[in-house]
Regions:
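Transmembrane helix-boundary elements of multi-pass transport/secretion proteins
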Residues: 1-78, 82-98, 119, 125-128, ...
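Generic alpha-helical secondary structure signal
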Residues: 17, 76, 135, 165-169
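Short amphipathic alpha-helical coupling elements at transmembrane boundaries
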Residues: 48-52, 121, 155, 159, ...
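Alpha-helical transmembrane segments of compact multi-pass small-molecule transporters, enriched
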Residues: 74, 78, 104, 132, ...
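Hydrophobic alpha-helical transmembrane segments of polytopic membrane proteins
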Residues: 98-120, 138-141, 192-199
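Transmembrane helix segments
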Residues: 120-164
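Short, membrane-exposed interhelical loops at transmembrane-helix boundaries
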Residues: 164-178
């Protein structure tokens, strides 16, 4: 049975909607989940116990975020399987670009959540900061409105948001079969975001420990 017979017609519209939804849902869950988890540890005082250990900030960050990388991979896999089986979304290819984009986006989202947790003193503050990031991502990334139809200043701000570039990778890979070579600008933008946010998170976490 085609997806148009299941309440999502036409198929191309359904595929476009689902491909736009994945980056936003993934960002929302990973950023908020990480920031809340780390803020909860701060409230409980478990982070202070790391002061007595020789573990470096980068090692702490990797240890804390590694399990959530697996959560993100499982989430993306389930999303793609459901999109194909339930809505018959076409999978045009471009798997190399999709895999690289997914991993960069997951790591970047988790690093951002970690960074926000170093700024927050409570779980409530962590949640508010996460929402403050998520809402502009929804409005400026092309999720709700066509990116090229937005004003120049909105496009400039949207280009700084990782969801924008991940959305292009997912949409291009699933609907058009765009490979890694053609998706290189968006991949490099995500990689730059990962490097910058990870560095900020490490510096901020080191300052917190000091």
């Amino acid at each position: 049975m085609r997806s148009s017979e299941r309440g999502c017609a036409p198929v191309s519209m359904c595929g476009a909607l689902i491909s736009r939804s994945e980056p936003y849902i993934l960002s929302m869950t990973l950023v908020m989940m990480t920031s809340l988890a780390m803020a909860r540890e701060r409230e409980r005082g478990t982070l202070e116990s790391l002061l007595a250990t020789p573990v470096r900030p980068l090692e702490v960050m990797i240890g804390k975020l590694a399990p959530y990388v697996g959560v993100g991979v499982v989430q993306v896999t389930l999303f793609l399987v459901m999109a194909r089986l339930l809505f018959d979304v076409p999978m045009a290819g471009g798997w190399d670009a999709l895999v690289v984009g997914v991993m960069l986006f997951i790591v970047g989202s988790l690093a951002l959540g970690f960074f926000l947790s170093t700024l927050a003193q409570t779980q409530m503050q962590a949640m508010q900061m996460s929402i403050f990031y998520i809402l502009p991502s929804m409005l400026l990334s092309g999720f709700l409105f066509p990116f090229r139809g937005m004003p120049d200043w909105a496009q400039a701000l949207g280009s700084l948001i990782p969801v924008t570039h991940f959305l292009r990778i997912v949409r291009g890979a699933l609907l058009k079969g765009v490979g890694l070579a053609d998706a290189w600008p968006s991949v490099m933008a995500l990689a730059a975001f990962v490097v910058v946010v990870t560095a900020l998170a490490i510096v901020r976490y080191r300052t917190t420990l000091d």
